[in-house]
Amino acid sequence: MAAGDGGRVSSGRDVACVTEVADTLGAMANQGFDFLCMPIFHPRFKREFYKEPAKSRPGPQTRSDLLLSGRDWNTLIVGKLSDWIKTDSEVSRIRKTSEAAMQQELNFSAYLGLPAFLIPLKQEDNSNLSRLLINHIHVGHHSTMFWMRVPLMAPNDLRDDLIENEPISLSEEDNSGEERTWIWWHNFRSLCDYNKKIALAIEIGADLPSGHVIDRWLGEPIKAAFLPTSIFLTNKKGFPVLTKVHQRLIFKLFKLEVQFVISGSHHHSEKDLCSYLQYLEYLSQNSPPPNAYEMFAKGYEDYLQSPLQPLMDNLESQTYEVFEKDPVKYSQYQQAVYKCLLDRVPEEEKETNIQILMVLGAGRGPLVNASLRAAKQAERKIKVYAVEKNPNAVITLEGWRYEEWGSQVTVVSGDMREWKAPEKADIIVSELLGSFGDNELSPECLDGAQHFLKDDGVSIPGEYTSYLAPISSSKLYNEVRACREKDRDPEAQFEMPYVVRLHNFHQLSDPLPCFTFHHPNKDDVIDNNRYCCLQYRVDLNTVLHGFAGYFNTVLYKDVTLSICPESHSPGMFSWFPILFPIKQPIPMREGDTVCVRFWRCNNGKKVWYEWAVTSPVCSAIHNPTGRSYTIGL
């Protein structure tokens, strides 16, 4: 379907009936609309499939496909199911007729090659509707998407009877009204087994549900948003505008690249219909600009990536290059080394006290450069060892040493755990952290290297903590499900973590700390196996699809880095969150407690995670013995 160019808003016009489809399409295009939502059959033409003589009525059932080119049908028309069709009617005759009519309309839309077909959800029980649709999807090989039109609030929940300025009571019954239409949608997509061809077209009314309910909707696969003309207000110049609350919702929908559909009759007689589009364009141009992190992550939204395993694999040059561009991480490392040098070397010793600094996992040298800058800033002397196991990156380090660093830096090619250091270090600096903190085996690496750290030596970072938060996301659940590999267990893809820029999701509760590691590790017996039990309260009806993982780290004293949402280091993009999926979505009721058990396991050769939900219901333990995913030591 036609999408907006660049940042332009993609918009459509919803019409109840079309007499001349080509003329109407042309008129809509002149107004600035990108596509047309229209009935494929005349809305009042109730076909008869069982009784004569109506059953055998001669003549075409609807207009010919020759009225438009195939390209126009494929890109500019969204079909609509006839309103009179009631596939879940308790009256047998109505149900059977509706089934046949729906089948006819679905087949004809597939024949036309429509990009999308609109089906309204008007009640909680849509079992037969879901059966008909999923059968249609499985029988054919068509590319049509199915947009389920669902109001954010059911019509009888709209608060027309509220007295102006009267305080609104938030009793349990009042809140249940906000839940109703989401339950329609959730039941429907569950019956259709989260099929990727079924998406959501929300209808935005004059009244909106509460903020946390809207946030839940934003975790659903929304493709379109219907804006009735009746919800627009009129400003002093006669132009249509929306309330501030509606504007905030529109801004959030822009981020999801939702297409907007204007429905209803023209309520601003002095202005053309295009004034509604002009207003949406105005909102788009005045929406909050993306920050540095969002700019960097553009195109990676909800794209699953396997976590890096730099201990087992040698990284490519381009991978190093991406991480080296981070404007925040290395300035924070520089600040940490700077403060550490000032603490360790008094002013009167700055000419004689040479600190031994070892960069463990030097890569292509960004930490070496940051440390040298810190020493210059602090006016302290350092001797640097740059230890790197990747022989390809060592070539780059030797180039740096030859051209820039000179004898101040010694390049060591080898594994830090096996290196026999000629002297002990005052400071060891490393960047071995993954999206979950310890998932790139920083604990094992630094524990193996701390024997060449002086007794009073400092590790940068000094500690790091992983965090977990329960999330709901149909999009991510389907993305994980699609990762099935031919020769593996059919559910193995649910037993491994993924690095992902979380976008189309809803976080159900605040992150809680999971595992913490300190360096240097002073324990008598070093054991990096871990277990934790985390509990979260859920404040609304929803579905659990997995857990988002984050971390924060203390580099040195008050110098920190974080990817936790509430404390994210501004402008830092070196790490996306990590996702731990679960095999089966778990429905959650308002007030439920999510309890998740998490293990970090190590058998001397590999490290892996195991996880299980134990409340409100028990899931299977995911990834036992590391059968689906391990991290090689």
Curated annotation (Swiss-Prot):
GO biological process, one term: cell division
UniProt KW keywords: Biological rhythms, Cell cycle, Cell division, Chromatin regulator, Cytoplasm, Methyltransferase, Mitosis, Nucleus, Repressor, S-adenosyl-L-methionine, Transcription, Transcription regulation, Transferase
Domain SAM-dependent MTase PRMT-type, first and last residues per copy: 304-611
Gene Ontology MF terms: E-box binding; histone arginine N-methyltransferase activity; histone H2AR3 methyltransferase activity; histone H4R3 methyltransferase activity; protein-arginine omega-N symmetric methyltransferase activity; transcription corepressor activity
UniProt tissue specificity: Detected in egg (at protein level).
Active site feature: 431, 440
Annotated residues for binding of S-adenosyl-L-methionine: 320, 329-330, 388, 414-416, 440
Cellular component terms (Gene Ontology): cytosol; Golgi apparatus; methylosome; nucleus
Subcellular location: Cytoplasm; Nucleus; Cytoplasm, Cytosol
InterPro entries: Arg_MeTrfase (IPR025799), Arg_MeTrfase_PRMT5 (IPR007857), PRMT5 (IPR035075), PRMT5_C (IPR035248), PRMT5_TIM (IPR035247), SAM-dependent_MTases_sf (IPR029063)
Pfam families xref list: PRMT5 (PF05185), PRMT5_C (PF17286), PRMT5_TIM (PF17285)
Superkingdom classification of source: Eukaryota
EC number per UniProt: 2.1.1.320
Reactions accelerated catalytically: L-arginyl-[protein] + 2 S-adenosyl-L-methionine = N(omega),N(omega)'-dimethyl-L-arginyl-[protein] + 2 S-adenosyl-L-homocysteine + 2 H(+)
UniProt: a protein binding residues: 323, 431, 440
Enzyme class: transferase
Subunit structure: Heterotetramer; dimer of heterodimer with wdr77. Interacts with wee2-a; this interaction is disrupted upon activation of the DNA replication checkpoint.
Record function comment: Arginine methyltransferase that can both catalyze the formation of omega-N monomethylarginine (MMA) and symmetrical dimethylarginine (sDMA), with a preference for the formation of MMA. Specifically mediates the symmetrical dimethylation of arginine residues in the small nuclear ribonucleoproteins; such methylation being required for the assembly and biogenesis of snRNP core particles. Methylates the arginine in the motif G-R-G-X-G in its substrates histone H2A, H2AX and H4, producing both monomethylated and symmetrically dimethylated 'Arg-3'.
Protein name per the record: Protein arginine N-methyltransferase 5
Organism: Xenopus laevis (African clawed frog)
Taxonomy of the source species: Eukaryota, Metazoa, Chordata, Craniata, Vertebrata
